[in-house]
Amino acid sequence: MKILVVGSGGREHALAWKLAQSERVQMVFVAPGNGGTARDQRLQNVAITDLNELADFVIREHVAFTVVGPEIPLAGGIVNLFRARGLKVFGPSKEAAQLESSKDFAKAFMKRHGIPTAEYETFSDAALAHADQLVFEGFAPKSA
């Protein structure tokens, strides 16, 4: 079987490396991959970052399933897109990925469900955009 691992970090390299050790796996593609995955003969980097083009690649190459590592393609809806096209993919939906990709969403979720978390404020006013430059005791600015 052929597998696609989406990402370029160490986590994706480790996943691809381990998957390639299975006798059932004939090829592991890594998109976009990194220098380490490029040197591993059991792995093949794929220079595609557009999600629709990646789905086309999966269909064309008869990839059995895709594993998505990084937050950016998850937040971009890769899982939703692949599922809509009938492709097998491991990862959270765009909506579920908001727990990691959006601090504002995650904080509101925790507050709504009574999950203990630090106090927070969310600002959308451009006049308050400088808040990320302020540093004082007890204040930890984060982008939403």
Feature locations, PLM:
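ATP-binding N-terminal substructure of ATP-dependent carboxylate-amine bond-forming enzymes
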Residues: 1-95, 100, 105
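Active-site nucleotide/adenylate-binding loops and adjacent lid/helix of ATP-dependent enzymes
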Residues: 4-5, 100-144
